[in-house]
Amino acid sequence: PNVVQVYEFSNEGEEGHILAMEYVEGCDLGHLMSAAKSTATRIPPWVAAWIIGEAAKGLHYAHEKRDEGGAPLDIVHRDVSPQNVLVGADGVARLVDFGIARASSKNRQATTGENDLKGKLAYMAPEQMRGDELDRRTDLFAMGVIVWEVLCGKRLFKADSEAATLQRI
């Protein structure tokens, strides 16, 4: 369903975690965008639309996921970015890296310390930066940023410093 499948997960304590995931031959959307920029070209709009549409299917799948009892899991990816959209050699785009995703009816911004944000700043929704309650709209904001960047061939909010990036958003 346009999401890279995780087959096995193991917590190895201090050594970290081990994930066995679906192998996707291809590259991430960020790499495709960089390659287009380095050759002074843009990804054709119809190709961009296909990739974004496929990635959006994966996001929708995650957002609609339910538990065994049928209750919504309310999954929020929180790190939707070109680097987390894998474009396979088979032409299918898949969403990857749910490492900081949250599944609960009250999705709060998780922090590991004061002012420690999770996710890539240039793709964060304003409510994510503020530490407000999050829902699927947070991920849709990030997807919108990706759409703009793919079609325009340049970054939307990225600035010279993190503070300047936050100000632009």
Language model features with spans:
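Conserved ATP-binding/catalytic core of the eukaryotic-like protein kinase fold
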Residues: 1-169
